[in-house]
Amino acid sequence: MTEHVQIKTAKWDSGEMEYFRFGRGKETLVIVPGLSVQSVMRSADAVAQAYKALTDDYTIYVFDRRKDLPAAYSVRDMAEDTASAFRALGLGQVNLFGASQGGMISMEIAVRCPELVKKLVLGSTSACVTEGQFALIEKWIQLAEDGDAAALYSAFGEALYPEALYNAARELLIELAKSVTDEELRRFVVMAKALKGFHITDELAKISCPVLVIGDEDDRVLGAEASREIADRMGGRPGVELYMYDGCGHAAYDTAPDYKERIARFLSGQAALE
């Protein structure tokens, strides 16, 4: 049985950020999650269980966004704060996995703080959020601003998960929505608005560490081409791999049964495409 995971706080001169840690391996794996209605800190035990197979080889850290979110907060701001949290904990040369918005944050860190990143895994993310992609996110923002947590959870889940899985989880999502606070909705709006105009495509060539890009053909949030574009912009250099699932949805990082194994193979130097 997975041991109960404790939530801790990383502190630096200008901010604080919650995180949790599990595993006992010599290597460090840091996970930066995507945009969510409620913090991943609420699901710490479930995350630890999901990554249990990696805990012998890795000590795993999962970071939230900073505690006191300002009204205007860009993805680059998020990356700067996350890097500050790394440094506050003495983390460097980490294996970094970012999913969705977390992938955008991770790309920013890899570009601006290359000394912090040993290997990079990017899941269901994009180097450039287009107006078409942001149109969906804008609908989520409106639901959050209206205070309609049930509709937000429903719309969010429908976009992230394959239809069958969403239909099976619909009642659970409605139940989860009952616990959403006004502050959680405010934070969601700030984080979602940060996606507008995000663009790091022209800087991807600066990333020199090994990179695994994982996408899904049925990604209804950012689209399958977003993952291909990232891999293409890396210049086809050695050390860059692209793997595309089909039918797992945007949240393939949760739904694909071999996702964690694929990450582990890449980090250990094996081909993730096998």
Regions found by a protein language model. Give the residues of each.
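Conserved HGGG/HGGXW glycine-rich cap/lid loop of the alpha/beta-hydrolase fold
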Residues: 9-69
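Gly/Ala-rich beta-loop-alpha elbow adjacent to hydrolase catalytic centers
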Residues: 98-102, 106
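Catalytic histidine neighborhood in serine/cysteine hydrolases
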Residues: 225-251
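Catalytic histidine-centered segment of alpha/beta-hydrolase-like enzymes
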Residues: 248-260
